[in-house]
Amino acid sequence: MELVLFDISPESPRDLYLPLSTNHRSSSVNGTLEPHGVTFFIIQGLTNLSERKMILFVILLLGYIIILGGNSMIIFVASTDPKLTSPMYFFLYNLSLVDMVYTTTTIPKMLSGFLTDVNTISMPGCFLQMHFFIQLGVTGYAILTVMAYDRYVAICNPLRYTAIMTRSIKLLLIMGAWGFAIFCTLPATSMTWKRPYCGPNVVRNGWCDLSSVRRLVCADTSVDNIVSVSFAILALLTTGVLILTSYVLIGVSMLRMGVAQRLKAFGTCAAHLTVVSISYGSASFVYISYRVGNFSAEDRIIVSVLFSALTPFLNPIIYSLRNKELQESIRRTLSRFRPAAVIALKDVNT
């Protein structure tokens, strides 16, 4: 998941954004200016890809299908299999749900734009997309933090694990993750929503990205930028430090274990550690790509789009490959549907 509270675009983005007019109130883009200002935005980040357009469409479509299918399977087995009672699967259920909704805020709209060449979005729709994309991204990091704490309790306090991770504590941790995300997201998006938009309405990105939309404001946004960066740092530092602390304590505890116990403990947190590394690594790569001059404007946007879907795409694959209980649960689920499919096929043949 890509955390986009940061303004990751270059300081002088002449190649990425159209220059704003000096008099926003007297300018008009495609005749959309009305007395009350801009009523919709035009998403133009992915409209000039020529032959790469269809390739990106196929990649996004297949990736989105896998994201929906893989995460839906995890949600189904985690909520219906009585053998998956560990709090870890409850948190994984919530992470998969967040991943599905997170990608749904942007990918369907982009796919529709590829097919129809209609890239407009209403002003309320733009800000709803912006808010939920950022909020769900932060929620994903917060849930990964909760899962790191869960692994810490399971490895460092195994005898007290069930007493600590009660149902009420699980719900409280998930509610805290959502509340933390809302707290970090709402100030920046609400400030951007209240700003005047009375001139250019072309968003140079694949979706209504916060920094891209804010460049269209016909007012001073220095305070907005400070607020956005402050809450972005808060979100990244809080989740990053807590995850790092959990794994440092896990590592210290593993040093006191025997080889067999150490391997077993590492196996229980390997999938989560892999997902965390990919999440922060992909966000860092996107940030760096906007600071390197070798990337063209279109390439930067493509990188941002693809990496925003990378973690939701890989999550179900990683957890399915690294978790034997989840693998067995998926096999049991598929075996329940297989006899019904065979019977239905026989009825058709007869």
Model regions: which residues?
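Transmembrane helical core of 7TM receptor-like proteins
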Residues: 1-350
